[in-house]
Structures are given as structure tokens and as C-alpha cells.
């Protein structure tokens, strides 16, 4: 019975044009998505852990010396827009680009956002451009990578729930490690 279900999964993957290699009874592509999302969440939560610390740190200590209120206001806007833009990013993928292209474009835009923020020392505008790029990239990336997990399995597959569990373990691992390590390094 299990071999029949595995064969059904392999046939589904082949029909989707996805590599049919299996790892621990799941499509190997699941683990690519696992690590991709893990590092994206590491990046997001790591940067969030450092954002307000950087903004309120005194200028003499390489920060911007903002008040707590101003730093939290920017943080609130950033976080709110990060959660709003996936609605638009999902529609863009559905109507224009497809999931894969949206994920790749989102990842590229977020990478440019991190690079821009790294140049903050040359001009403060790089910091703001970086935040905007991070928001826009997240909007394209976040809703679509989860959709790709669902496409790996037939609707009737009993392994679909387990696949999402594995995927969400990557999300939670990245978030935990990002806050822990980046917060520690930032201090």
C-alpha cells in the first residue's frame, strides 16, 4: 500500500515537472524549500532583532541615536508592510509571474535590500531603500513559497500534512536562530 502511495507521489512530481528524487519519503524539493525558507526567516528575524537596537544606539557607538518612540514607529511601519505586501505578491504570482518567478524575484529583491542596508554608512538613504526592498521582496517571496510546498503533493496524499510540518520546522528554526544569533552578535 505504501509503495502505491509513493508511486502516486512520484507520478505527481513527474507530471509537475519536478525532480522525482525522494528523501525520507518526501520530494527532495521539499528540503530545498525548507532551507530556502529557513535562511529567509533567519534573515528577516535577525534583521528585526537588530533594527531598533541600531536605531536607538548612540551615534558615538555607530547607531543613529533615535528616540525609542521614533524607532518603534519605524519598526511598526516596517512590520505592518511586511505582513501587508504578501497579499499583493500572491496576486502578482497568480496573475502574472507564477510562483517560481515570484520567489526568485522576491529573493533577489530582498538580497539587494540587505546589500543596500550594508551600505548605510555611506548614506542614510541606503538604509531606507534597503527597508523598502526588503518589504517588496518579502511580498513576492513569502506567500508563494508555501504554495510551492502544496504543489509537491497530490491533493489526496497523506504525506502533504507531514510535508508542511517539515517546511514549518524550517521557518521556526530560521526565526529562532536569526533572533538568537543576530541579537547576540548585535550586542
Put a short name on every predicted segment.
Residues 49-72:
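Short amphipathic helix-loop junctions that connect adjacent transmembrane helices
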Residues 113, 124-141:
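Hydrophobic core of transmembrane alpha-helices in multi-pass small-molecule transporters
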